[in-house]
Amino acid sequence: MAAITASMVGELRAKTDAPMMECKKALTEADGNMEKAEELLRIKLGNKAGKASGRITAEGVVTAFVDGAAGGMIEINCETDFVTKNDSFLAMANAAAMLVAKHNPADIAALGALPYEQDGFGPTLEDVRKGLIGKIGENMSFRRFKHFAGNGKLASYLHGTRIGVMVEFEGDDTSAKDVAMHIAAMKPVAIQASDVPADLIEKERAVAAGKAEEDRKTAEAEGKKPQPAEIVAKRIEGGVQKYLKEVSLHNQPFVKNDKQTVEQMLKAANTSIKGFTLYVVGEGIEKKVDDFAAEVAAQVAAAKAAA
């Protein structure tokens, strides 16, 4: 059984907004597995446990560059928020997005090998990165990037430096820009419900089934008759369909006018979305959370051993 620390409980609470004791119970039941604990909380507490699940703790920036029909978007990570405001770091990030757009490198290594000079460092982008690490005193890395070309026109939107969206489209430029802004705010996972990845659908189905099972246990404990199996099956499927509407771009209420869906807005503007890419800084990265009590205890033990 994994040890459940206060920092683990705090991290799960920050992600879910669930009560501290519920977070501790979920972590204990999940044997310390953060993702499993988060899923257990969703089953027990419903959507209340998902309100803050999109919070990301890793630092860095996302930036984009569009030059006609070609574009590039990149995420660069660092250790602290302080560096994300450094002019040299931002200049390198913007240059990297431009290099992605212009050269379409095959991978991170190929991107780093491209010619670029800045702040007296060079002759490659990788040399500049290493030089800035020494100058600023903090590690930084190119995490991911994407090159865009050949799938229609491009519209980009950056929400500060933490969220970036690139939209491939045909039609009205202003409408496409509005959709990019909408994607940054609402974070859809696909254009249409039929495009939502199967693994996400099955995960949502499992959560809905788990919630139904919790309701059955509660009903039995209260001496009530559980719902018939066919009703439960409809509830589960209804939950899945609700999820699909919430995460598919076309079905979402348009953020600038919630009286119409994005699909309706696009149809009125004679515009179609061919594809989109959403980057959120640190998405999928687990930030190291120190257990300070354990750290202090280790330091005391080391001091005693050295005495």
From Swiss-Prot:
Q: Which GO terms describe its cellular component?
A: cytoplasm
Q: Does the keyword DNA damage apply?
A: no
Its annotated function is as follows: Associates with the EF-Tu.GDP complex and induces the exchange of GDP to GTP. It remains bound to the aminoacyl-tRNA.EF-Tu.GTP complex up to the GTP hydrolysis stage on the ribosome.
Lineage start: Bacteria, Pseudomonadati, Pseudomonadota, Betaproteobacteria, Burkholderiales
The reply to whether Cytoplasm figures as a keyword in the UniProt entry is yes
Which SUPFAM superfamilies does the record cross-reference, listed alphabetically? Elongation factor Ts (EF-Ts), dimerisation domain, UBA-like
Q: Which PROSITE patterns match?
A: EF_TS_2 (PS01127)
- What name does the UniProt record give this protein? Elongation factor Ts
- Give the span(s) annotated as Involved in Mg(2+) ion dislocation from EF-Tu: 80-83
One Pfam family linked to the record: EF_TS
Q: Which family does it belong to?
A: Belongs to the EF-Ts family.
Localization: Cytoplasm
- Disulfide bridge partners, by residue number: none
InterPro entries from the UniProt entry: EF-Ts_dimer_sf (IPR036402), Transl_elong_EFTs/EF1B (IPR001816), Transl_elong_EFTs/EF1B_dimer (IPR014039), Transl_elong_Ts_CS (IPR018101), UBA-like_sf (IPR009060)
* Entry-linked Gene3D superfamilies: 1.10.286.20, DNA helicase RuvA subunit, C-terminal domain, Elongation factor Ts, dimerisation domain
Q: Which GO terms describe its molecular function?
A: translation elongation factor activity
**Keywords recorded for this protein, A-Z:** Cytoplasm, Elongation factor, Protein biosynthesis
Q: Classify the main location.
A: cytoplasm
